[in-house]
């Protein structure tokens, strides 16, 4: 499988990216190198190798889910850099 500049142009349009002609050639080359590497991985003999979902033997690395009393609104608002009544006050982010 090979990637053409037409393919890269299509992908760039989907991603809303714009490339110069030099960048387009570079991206085409780099994508072809990646695909070539993946093709090499497909050639690896994995006969007799067990499939793995993880590389280590850890069974459960999560802590126990223990229920605690929730913080009061007052305690939570003590962490607020700025507040108004019972609410966090944050800078406007939408014009």
UniProtKB/Swiss-Prot annotation:
Its EC number is 6.3.5.-. It is an enzyme of class 6 (ligase). Signal peptide: none annotated. It holds the Pfam family GatC. One of its GO terms (molecular function) is ATP binding. Keywords: ATP-binding, Ligase, Nucleotide-binding, Protein biosynthesis. GO terms for biological process: glutaminyl-tRNAGln biosynthesis via transamidation; regulation of translational fidelity; translation. It catalyses: L-glutamyl-tRNA(Gln) + L-glutamine + ATP + H2O = L-glutaminyl-tRNA(Gln) + L-glutamate + ADP + phosphate + H(+); L-aspartyl-tRNA(Asn) + L-glutamine + ATP + H2O = L-asparaginyl-tRNA(Asn) + L-glutamate + ADP + phosphate + 2 H(+). Allows the formation of correctly charged Asn-tRNA(Asn) or Gln-tRNA(Gln) through the transamidation of misacylated Asp-tRNA(Asn) or Glu-tRNA(Gln) in organisms which lack either or both of asparaginyl-tRNA or glutaminyl-tRNA synthetases. The reaction takes place in the presence of glutamine and ATP through an activated phospho-Asp-tRNA(Asn) or phospho-Glu-tRNA(Gln). PANTHER family: GLUTAMYL-TRNA(GLN) AMIDOTRANSFERASE SUBUNIT C, MITOCHONDRIAL (PTHR15004:SF0). NCBIfam families: gatC. Heterotrimer of A, B and C subunits. HAMAP family: GatC (MF_00122). Belongs to the GatC family. This is Aspartyl/glutamyl-tRNA(Asn/Gln) amidotransferase subunit C. It comes from Pelodictyon phaeoclathratiforme (strain DSM 5477 / BU-1). The lineage of its organism: Bacteria, Pseudomonadati, Chlorobiota, Chlorobiia, Chlorobiales. The gene is gatC.
